[in-house]
Amino acid sequence: MPLPGNVIQNSSIDAQTLINDAPLSRYQWLIAIICFLIVFVDGIDTAAMGFIAPALAQDWGVDRSQLGPVMSAALGGMIFGALLSGPAADRFGRKVVLILSMLVFGGFSLASAYAGNLDTLVILRFLTGIGLGAAMPNATTLFSEYCPDRIRSLLVTCMFCGYNLGMATGGFISGWMIPAYGWHSLFLLGGWAPLALTVLVIFVLPESYRFLIVRGGDTEKVRRILSHIAPERVQGVTHFHVPEETTQGASKNSLAMLFSVKYAKGTLLLWLTYFMGLVVIYLLTSWLPTLMRETGASMERAAFIGGLFQFGGVVSALFVGWAMDRFNPHRVIAGFYFVAGVFAFTVGQSLGNPTLLAVLILCAGIAINGAQSAMPALSARFYQTQCRATGVAWMSGIGRFGAVFGAWIGAVLLGNNWTFTDILNMLLIPATAAAAAVFLKSLVSHTDAP
């Protein structure tokens, strides 16, 4: 069936409208798979230290409270990496930042396997974290810019669940890898996997077409990219544009734009929400295997329970993304945060029943990881192209202070003889704060970018 003549004959076309009108192509699915794999290996490496900690403490003869700096080092690096990578990606491109970040976290993860003491490991995990912090938000940003508006939240949330799946996979496989091959093996896996994937990113993954358009890139390059998605629509087109290119311009400083009248309130509330959510997630991710060992669980069972918590985010991704595209996305996420706090509280009351404990940990993982996985999608749809990578990355970077705090406060509470039940009960506070912050954003700054 021929397309209307004015579509083919126009010399200029809105590239986002082209994406919105076309069915999802194999090319977009390929981009989704590559970005999924990027955040998957990011998740494995991010979670590695939490699963390694019990074996490392035993091997090196150190007390669990001494592991606090090691547990937090990668998170500190992730802050640094995220804050730098966002503006860099908005200036130089998403793809080049992705390549560099994967080389960094892959290389230093390999080096971590050969660390001989805690001080060396702290340095190597910090450097690994720089790459980890840069990779995840930029993969999210790049993929979101290839999604049609009608299902963007669903697709981005499903892609981002690769992060949770990676963290869960780290837990499941560490249960047999560490006893069989030693704690070094998980670092080796976390190093070689991203280095191998970098080859695919270099030769297959395209740059964001929106970035190329806004930065005044080569029209022919944009045409080649979009021809994989809607070949019949780009014939004869001499200029591609996107809404914000014509209405906002491309010369503004991306970081300054986050604090403009349009974005300032929403930016601060996104940061607060992400911060509080990561307090909950990283306290549990970093210390759940160790805490489970303290209750008498075997290393294999402790790793399995930790993996089960992360797997919950994979289970909820489809529903959360679907709901965000159909209802107020802020209130969907707020509901998941609050329910997560309730489940964390009930987990603390169920330590004597292993079966019920596993079910409740899965439910807590479904709620908190589902909410947190949806935040990059919410951020990506809030900011326009000129500051999208910066917005997503700075939410991730500032939020990582919550991750550092969560990992650190776990060591402090354990050192002060808090029980597992006490710690889990306390998590209701940051979970409720996250729910309140994102709900408030729905009232004061709800508008999506064009």
Predicted features, each with a name:
Residues 49-50, 259-317:
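Extracytoplasmic gate region of multi-pass secondary transporters
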Residues 1-21, 205-262:
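Intracellular cytosolic loops and amphipathic helices of Major Facilitator Superfamily
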Residues 61, 93, 114-120, 148, ...:
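Helix-breaking motifs and short loop linkers at transmembrane-helix boundaries and internal kinks
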Residues 200-204, 428-450:
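Multi-pass alpha-helical transporter architecture, strongest
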Residues 179-192, 414-429:
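A membrane-interface helix-boundary motif in multi-pass transporters
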